[in-house]
Curated annotation (Swiss-Prot):
UniProt name for this protein: Bifunctional protein GlmU
Top-tier EC class: transferase
Top-level taxon in the UniProt lineage: Bacteria
Gene it is expressed from: glmU
Gene Ontology molecular functions: glucosamine-1-phosphate N-acetyltransferase activity; magnesium ion binding; UDP-N-acetylglucosamine diphosphorylase activity
Amino acid sequence: MTDQNLAIVVLAAGQGTRMKSATPKLLHPLGGIPVIAHVLETARALEAAEVVAVVRHERDRLAEVIGVELPEAVIVDQDEVPGTGRAVEQAVAALPADFSGDVLVVNGDVPLLDAGTLRELIAAHRAGGSAATILSAFPAVAAGYGRIVRTSTGRLDRIVEHKDATEAERAIGEINAGIYVFGAAALRDKLAAITTDNAQGEKYITDVIGLLRESGFDVDALPVSDSWLVDGINDRAQLSEAAAKLNALTVRAWQLAGVTVQDPATTWIDVRVRLAPDVTLLPGTQLRGATAVETGATIGPDTTLLDTEVGAGATVKRTDATLAVIGAAATVGPFAYLRPGTVLGADGKIGTFVETKNAVIGAGAKLAHFNYVGDAEVGEKSNLGAGVITANYDGVNKHRTEIGSHVRVATNTVFVAPVRMGDGAYTGAGTVVRKDVPAGSLAVTVAPQRNIEGWVAQRRPGTDAARAAQRNGAAEASNAAEESGE
């Protein structure tokens, strides 16, 4: 149910220079989705009446992602006046003029912050009757953060930036997490009063807190249960730390949901992956994107699946698959490479050193080893022997190969596409199929074997091969002489 008294402001205008990247900080992937997508998902879960996202640097790229992840969000461009206070000021101006509820302000770079924590913050704010409530934290190292200084009654007195703090204030372990809930009326009033009269020439949202206290309003601070919930991401090291924490949380959640994860330290699961109970993940498994695995399947070891569907009871080991579908009870690997468009039917097999692309492989069909099958269809219960390939590319265009059901394709057969092989047909070893093969036929390409005597001695004299042939010839001559009694 929509909370008509809640508006959310997502701050996404920062440049993120410490990332040292052409990609905006908030668009770096974390758990398979952009950093800001985590914050937008949390905003959606709160069911606010209004959501406003403030952008500036790389605004078009950010706006595109925001539009996909949270289409209902209003996008506001921050102007030339810098600072978080100015960003919030412009966001509030985009709210309906008669909005009189609460405004939650959250940074776009706190992906681990969950909806439950924000609900607690909003509830505490409403219960306390304060003009503003701040989320605070007790990190292991507080250096560099603004400190929360409380009154004797426990209310927030002021926020002191680290550089301005006394020794006694620096000893305070509680810091400002940079996430706020304001009453809309008080926020509008004080935003109009903040200035850029400071060393950085910026409008700070923290100045609103100071102005509220100076005007006699109460301001509260609510500590989070774990400081990592409000950890921001400013550089690659922090991104890596957040990824590790998020993955640990994700893996544990799936374990509690009935998934066996043999080695959590080497298993990575993106946040939009879906797993059924009784799935088993072996060491070195990476499940990326929107991968979905059904009950009883075993994945790994050393397997990466991206946007891939795995059916119930399937086994996939030492495999790399992207945009593929693996049927129930199918077997894949080891050392298989499934490229986009691969569909393997139930009980099918893609075995060792097999590569497939844009290929539909029927139920019970087998590609056991050393195959390339691209732009092809293989019917049910067909079997492709070792070394079978589809030659699908003529240098300009790709062409399809169609192999019927219950077909037996012998070792080292090459299909020169476009070509079709009917149901129940066979090929002989080494066949090059250039024409369609009727159902129930045997296709063979046989040429007489020609042996050119003495070729190595003439064309490769002095080589190890020539010397070996010479020794063999001498031995054969000696044996022949003995047999003739000479």
